Swiss-Prot record:
This is DNA-directed RNA polymerase subunit Rpo10. It catalyses: RNA(n) + a ribonucleoside 5'-triphosphate = RNA(n+1) + diphosphate. Zn(2+) binds at C7, C10, C44, C45. One of its GO terms (cellular component) is cytoplasm. Binds 1 zinc ion. PANTHER family: DNA-DIRECTED RNA POLYMERASES I, II, AND III SUBUNIT RPABC5, DNA-DIRECTED RNA POLYMERASES I, II, AND III SUBUNIT RPABC5 FAMILY MEMBER. Its EC number is 2.7.7.6. One of its GO terms (biological process) is DNA-templated transcription.
Length: 65
């Protein structure tokens, strides 16, 4: 799955927040603090970013038939 472009529930654009969110969380920062800093207040948007799993690099390793 690619990073989410919009919230699945309310439709708010989230694509521009994905890279910063992912970088900061991977560095060990608390996801709650990162989401608060990014200005995400709605729980649906927070859920969308928290639950996103990017598997594209894994899929790209397989050859096309």
């Amino acid at each position: 799955m690619l990073p989410p472009i919009r919230c699945f529930s309310c439709g708010k654009p989230l694509g521009h927040l994905w890279e910063e969110f992912n970088e900061r969380v991977n560095k060990g920062e608390d996801p709650k603090k990162v989401l608060d800093d990014l200005g995400l207040e709605r729980y649906c948007c927070r859920r969308t970013l928290l639950s996103a799993v990017v598997v594209f690099p894994v899929i790209a390793k397989f050859k096309k038939v």
